[in-house]
From Swiss-Prot:
Signal peptide: none
NAD keyword on record: yes
Record protein name field: Mannitol-1-phosphate 5-dehydrogenase
Catalytic activity: D-mannitol 1-phosphate + NAD(+) = beta-D-fructose 6-phosphate + NADH + H(+)
Originating species: Actinobacillus pleuropneumoniae serotype 3 (strain JL03)
EC number: 1.1.1.17
Pfam family name, one: Mannitol_dh
Family matches, as Gene3D superfamilies: N-(1-d-carboxylethyl)-l-norvaline Dehydrogenase, domain 2, NAD(P)-binding Rossmann-like Domain
GO MF terms held by the record: mannitol-1-phosphate 5-dehydrogenase activity
PROSITE patterns cross-referenced by the UniProt entry: MANNITOL_DHGENASE
Residues that hold NAD(+) according to the record: 3-14
Amino acid sequence: MNALHFGAGNIGRGFIGKLLADSGVFVTFADINQTQIDQINQNKQYGVKIVGDASRVEVVKNIAAINSKDEEAVIEQVKSVELITTAVGPNVLGFIAPLFAKALAARLEAGNTQPLNIIACENMVRGTSFFKAKIFENLTASQQAEIEKFVGFVDSAVDRIVPPAELNEADPLEVTVEEFSEWIVDKTQFKGQIPDIKGMELTDNLMAFVERKLFTLNTGHLISAYLGKQAGVKWIKEAIAIDSVKAAVKATMEESGAVLIKRYNFDPQAHAAYIEKILKRFANPYLNDDVNRVGREPIRKLSPNDRLIKPLLGTLEYGLPHKNLVNGVVMALQYRNEEDPQAVELAQFIADNGVAAAVEKYTGLTNQEVIDQVVALYN
């Protein structure tokens, strides 16, 4: 089986690309980093350093790479592969959608009606459905109808912490990852036979898993980063080692967890164990996870479907406590990082228009009581 994977960054190489290659799939990476592309094509392999209680290096083979700016190369791949995955970041999906539309149209014209499945592996809710909508903006109604027949747009939830690591001179493509990984896909959205990929779990209730991960791992990770930054530490593992930080992170995940328990009938004890597992992952002594990396892009993280506002809206829906989630929103608004364009934009907007206007603009919150709480805590 042949797959095209967009994004040869740490997640692409250390998570999705690895799972595909481990299952005997030939993976062609598409990326804009020509140095990395050349390294993949020359070395035809790279190491994945898995760090934890039993650290080891596993080698990924059966790979090639193309430059995603080379439209012809991308189109040729899309015309023939059976699976396409992405790990490019939510913001990039919209940029590559016109090229995907052109490539899928070319596949149609070439007469290839074999099933093709596309899975966006991004930190967002129903990322593939979003990607599909962006692709379809560039296609005619008749093209859309034809593509619907043989292309599956499969939503997924992905979870693996893959922080940047020191360059290994002997293997510049080597990537460091934690032991834990979770890739859950919506089995109802595939076209044709579902590919047999070790480590890819199937479900018909994806939103429960998407929100479990978003409301727990992502929410907790972000709170750890903000509190760690306030405490003056560099790494997430240092932040979570501070008792008051760990307590606040856990309390926030418990607030968002109460929404999940109510919404999806999760077992409270099982969810409490899931929270403990995540706290242990944050404390992994082998992972150098920078608080600025985790805290970056506050505008995206304050959006209505993301890790702070979505669980907060859930607490309002069910009449549940949300003190810690509100604190999280305040910390996101207070996040300052001169090297992060979103942080700069947010700070400037607050300076020009005030906190209440920023809350309304970026979060979509309409509950006046909560907006007032945020403003009071910010000032």
